[in-house]
Design a protein with these regions (language model features):
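N-terminal presequences and immediately downstream first alpha-helices
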Residues: 1-41
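N-terminal cap/lid segment of alpha/beta-hydrolase-fold proteins
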Residues: 27-76
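Core residues of folded domains in eukaryotic genome-function proteins
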Residues: 50, 67-69, 82, 108-111, ...
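Short, surface-exposed "cap/lid" segments of acyl-processing enzymes
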Residues: 74-126, 145
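Catalytic nucleophile-loop/oxyanion-hole region of alpha/beta-hydrolase
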Residues: 95, 104, 118-161
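Primarily recognizes the serine-hydrolase "nucleophile elbow" in alpha/beta-hydrolase
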Residues: 145-197
C-alpha cells in the first residue's frame, strides 16, 4: 500500500498564501490536537458571523420535513476565496475547533461559511431530524448557496474559488458530497458534470 506524500506542495502553499501546518509538542497527532481544545481553551474574538439560513428539502427517508440550516458567514474585505467549514459529530459552528479554524482562515484573507448541520444547535429549531455521514440532500443545497456567495462576495466579476474543510465526521460528509451523483447535483442546482467544490 502506498501512502500519499505527507509534505505539502510548496507552490500550492505559496499560491494560497499559507504556511504549512507544523505539529508542536505536546499536541502530536489528531487525538491530542482534538483534546487540546478541551484542556487548553483558546481566547477567541467575539463571534461576528452574519447569520444565513439555507433552505434544505425533506429527508428522502421521510424522517424529517424540509427546513433550513443555520450558517454564519465571516467575510474579510476583498476575500481570496470562500471556505465552507463543516463541524464534526456533536459539534456546531460555535465549537472552538471550528471557530479557531474560521478565525485563522479569516486572518489569512478567506471568507468562511460555518455550517450547522440538521439537528445541531443553534439552528436545531429550523429543521427536524439529524445529520449523518451521507446527507447530500442537505449538503448540496449548501454548496449551491456557497457558489452564489462566491459570485456576490467579489467586486472583480469573476466568482471567488470555493473550498471546503470538514472536521472529523464533517470531513466524511464533505467527501461524500464531492462524490455525489449527477442527478443529486442537478436537484441541488449544481452543474451535473462538475464537482460541487
Amino acid at each position: 500500500m502506498s501512502w500519499p506524500d505527507p509534505h505539502p506542495d510548496p507552490q500550492l502553499l505559496k499560491q494560497l498564501g499559507v504556511a504549512p501546518f507544523r505539529q508542536r509538542l505536546p499536541w502530536w497527532g489528531g487525538d491530542l490536537q482534538t483534546l487540546r481544545d478541551t484542556l487548553r481553551p483558546v481566547d477567541l474574538p467575539t463571534d461576528q458571523g452574519q447569520p444565513l439560513e439555507i433552505q434544505v428539502p425533506a429527508l428522502s427517508s421521510g424522517a424529517a420535513g424540509s427546513g433550513a440550516l443555520l450558517s454564519f458567514l465571516d467575510c474579510p474585505p476583498a476575500p481570496k476565496a470562500l471556505v465552507v467549514v463543516w463541524h464534526g459529530l456533536g459539534g456546531s459552528s460555535r465549537r472552538e475547533g471550528v471557530r479557531r479554524l474560521g478565525v485563522a482562515l479569516g486572518t489569512a484573507g478567506y471568507a468562511v461559511l460555518r455550517l450547522n448541520m440538521r439537528g445541531a444547535d443553534p439552528g436545531r429549531h429550523l429543521a427536524g431530524g439529524t445529520y449523518a455521514a451521507q446527507c447530500n440532500s442537505d449538503l448540496l443545497p449548501v454548496l449551491h448557496r456557497a457558489r452564489q456567495l462566491c459570485s456576490t462576495l467579489t467586486s472583480e466579476g469573476t466568482p471567488l474559488p470555493l473550498f471546503g474543510a470538514g472536521l472529523s465526521l464533517g470531513g466524511t460528509m464533505l467527501l461524500n458530497a464531492c462524490l455525489s451523483t449527477s442527478a443529486e447535483r442537478v436537484a441541488a442546482g449544481l452543474d451535473p458534470a462538475g464537482l460541487p467544490l
